[in-house]
Amino acid sequence: DDHYDVISAFIKSMRGSDPDATMHYLARMLRAGEDPRFIARRIMIAASEEVGMAAPQILQVTVAAAQAVAMIGMPEARIILAEAALAVATAPKSNASYNAINSALADVDAGLIGQVPLHLRNAPTALMKSWGNHEGYRYAHDWPGAVAPQQYMPDELKGREYYHPNEVKPRLEKIRRILHDEDETQQ
């Protein structure tokens, strides 16, 4: 179905950092009568899933755009959608948050949860304090750089790492060179 093919190409163009293809597919969706709010939601998802921690402010841009689209409507919403989609397409990319939460969820689904360390547990009552809850907790802001040397993961998951950030590289000119070189090799 063309509807799904065009939205797929739109998302993949933002992911692939091609602002021109992003605009092409956005224009096709708008001319086909796609709901601008649907497009705005897809752009917000792309901001989190594709850009993520490489430029976390892009999510704020896309949320503001979605709100503006809902308030303003067409035809001016096209400009707001274009700005938000271009912000995603031209931003540095990282799917590290996406991968991190999926890895953590896979562990939880597999039953790898362990016990919350005693020093991290809540202790609002004398009874809970007598169990050792909260004892030995180090308040992060009392330590240099606000990083307290203590174990946060359950013993069963000690050393487990979920978050693996990417390097952010120079963007648009390099990408355009790569895209043009790739186009030439496919002809």
PLM regions and their residue ranges:
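Inter-lobe coupling/hinge segments of SF2-like helicase ATPases
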Residues: 1-7, 18
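Terminal-proximal interaction/regulatory segments of ATP-powered molecular machines
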Residues: 16-141, 145-147, 151-187
